[in-house]
Curated annotation (Swiss-Prot):
<dbReference type="InterPro" id="IPR017703">
    <property type="entry name" value="YgfZ/GcvT_CS"/>
</dbReference>
<dbReference type="Pfam" id="PF25455">
    <property type="entry name" value="Beta-barrel_CAF17_C"/>
</dbReference>
<feature type="region of interest" description="Disordered">
    <location>
        <begin position="367"/>
        <end position="396"/>
    </location>
</feature>
<dbReference type="GO" id="GO:0016226">
    <property type="term" value="P:iron-sulfur cluster assembly"/>
</dbReference>
<dbReference type="GO" id="GO:0005759">
    <property type="term" value="C:mitochondrial matrix"/>
</dbReference>
<protein>
    <recommendedName>
        <fullName>Iron-sulfur cluster assembly factor IBA57 homolog, mitochondrial</fullName>
    </recommendedName>
</protein>
<keyword id="KW-0809">Transit peptide</keyword>
<dbReference type="GO" id="GO:0016740">
    <property type="term" value="F:transferase activity"/>
</dbReference>
<feature type="transit peptide" description="Mitochondrion">
    <location>
        <begin position="1"/>
        <end position="28"/>
    </location>
</feature>
<dbReference type="InterPro" id="IPR045179">
    <property type="entry name" value="YgfZ/GcvT"/>
</dbReference>
<comment type="similarity">
    <text>Belongs to the GcvT family. CAF17/IBA57 subfamily.</text>
</comment>
<keyword id="KW-0496">Mitochondrion</keyword>
<dbReference type="InterPro" id="IPR027266">
    <property type="entry name" value="TrmE/GcvT_dom1"/>
</dbReference>
């Protein structure tokens, strides 16, 4: 009998129209559990009971999704514009370019009952389980006269899994996601899946029929390694890799895809055509600087400032967990703009949307970083309304932002490209100024 960490869910509708760096702090309750999640094993798999599925079937389903998501539904650089054969990480945006839902999209397996009698394209959309009805409403709003059917799958119809193996060299997908050999499943298989590209070596995402154990469908040890772990342990592993997931962490109609690292996670195709919310995303990618990004954070009390580039999870650590949405500020106490927002956590680790040049040593522009190695940051919050003010004092915990090596490399390469672009622009302006001065000098000589 599997053990799944129980959690309290709160509606985030009241947060959907507020900016993450507003001066008014809106706290969201953190999931609570009687049992502290264990440290994730080097290999294993987890049943993701917090994820839901929507099926989209019909002749227009591919074109329909192509106009709504950040990823490309067609094979890149294919002159015949063939439909992609693999699943992918992606996002649905609103017209202002803010995230509605993070999602995975998979081709419907041919062995599935919904596609067994037709050659029409069909897709499975995996999304935060609490957001299925909201996304379904969004899809129906854009359906218009498209020839397709939308349906939310019932509990037990299919199960979403995360599976990972120990890799001596953490890296991106070992095979080309667009190649014919990218899918390990036979054409008649009822299993859907894809490489989870959100972090190097993070593993695979799989969708199986029914509620049976993953090994029933994939008995080969080469495909599934280790033992099943609970949802809480998967969450710890996800946060250690700096991956935000669901609208408790990627706030609906507030979060921006690049601030959520969706560009690095291969969730955005900057070469594809128009889709809802494309304008701001493309403009930021080509001309802007992403000053805030979601990174893993280490929570600590009075212990020394943690060292290292990645957080360390300690199930025995006695650290108070801040409410989601809490402001991060400098320990020195001087008032100033927020350095970041705490999004959620487990034990002594979590995720936060951080101003990189304040909370880390990353340099984004020629202005340099504003951070100091000795600078500490804190999260302070008041007692819950239901708690007695006579017995509960305001809580506080220290926090350190840690940029994983792969994210640091990605950001640095973008900064270098931006610097080269700026240098090129400055060079052109310098040449134009030189030509202008030469013309003015020539005119003075002729006078």
């Amino acid at each position: 009998m599997r053990s799944i960490a129980s959690s309290k869910r709160v509606c985030t509708h009241c947060l959907s129209h507020s900016r993450l760096f507003s001066t008014t702090v809106q706290h969201r309750a953190q999931p609570s559990s009687d049992a502290v999640p264990s440290s994730p094993p080097r290999s294993g798999y987890a049943r993701l009971t917090n994820r839901g599925l929507i099926s989209i079937t019909g002749v227009d389903s591919t074109t329909f999704l192509q106009g709504l998501i950040t990823q490309n539904m067609l094979v890149a650089n294919d002159p015949s514009r063939a439909t992609r054969r693999t699943g992918t990480y992606t996002a649905f945006l609103n017209s202002q370019g803010r995230v509605l839902n993070d999602a995975f999209i998979y081709p419907m397996p041919k062995g599935d009952g919904e596609t067994a009698t037709t050659d029409d394209p069909a897709w499975l959309v995996e999304v935060d389980k609490n957001e299925v009805s909201s996304l379904l409403k969004h899809l129906k709003k854009h359906k218009l006269r498209s020839k397709l059917k939308l349906r939310a799958l019932e509990d037990g119809e299919r199960t979403v899994w995360s599976s990972w193996k120990d890799h001596s060299e953490p890296r991106w997908a070992a095979y080309n996601l667009e190649s014919e050999s990218s899918s390990p499943f036979s054409p008649s298989s009822s299993v859907a899946g894809c490489i989870d590209t959100r972090a190097p070596g993070f593993g695979s995402r799989l969708v199986t029929p029914g509620e049976e154990d993953l090994r029933v469908h994939l008995p080969d040890e080469a495909q599934v390694a280790g033992s099943e772990v609970d949802l809480g342990t998967y969450t710890v592993r996800r946060m250690l890799h700096g991956i935000a997931e669901g609208q408790a962490e990627i706030i609906r109609e507030s979060a921006l895809p690049l601030e959520c690292n969706m560009d690095m996670m291969r969730g955005v195709d900057f070469r594809k055509g128009c889709y809802v919310g494309q304008e701001l995303t493309i403009r930021t990618h080509h001309t802007g600087v992403v000053r805030k990004r979601i990174v893993p954070v280490q929570l600590y009390a009075k212990s020394p400032l943690p060292s290292g580039e990645t957080p360390v999870y300690d199930p025995t650590a006695a650290v108070a967990l801040p409410p989601s949405g809490s402001n991060i500020s400098k320990v020195d106490g001087r008032k100033g703009r927020s350095a970041g927002k705490f999004l959620g956590g487990v034990g002594n680790i979590g995720l936060a949307l951080c101003r990189l040049e304040i909370m880390t040593d990353i340099v984004l522009t020629g202005e340099g970083s504003q951070s100091s190695p000795e600078q500490e940051f804190k999260i302070s919050w008041s007692a819950p309304e239901e708690a007695s003010s006579d017995t509960t004092e305001p809580a506080e915990v220290k926090v350190k932002a840690l940029v994983p090596p792969w994210l640091r490399e990605y950001i640095s390469s973008g900064a270098r490209n931006l610097a080269r672009k700026v240098d090129s622009q400055e060079g052109h302006r310098a040449k134009e100024l030189l030509y202008q001065l030469e013309e003015e000098e020539e005119q003075r000589r002729n006078e």
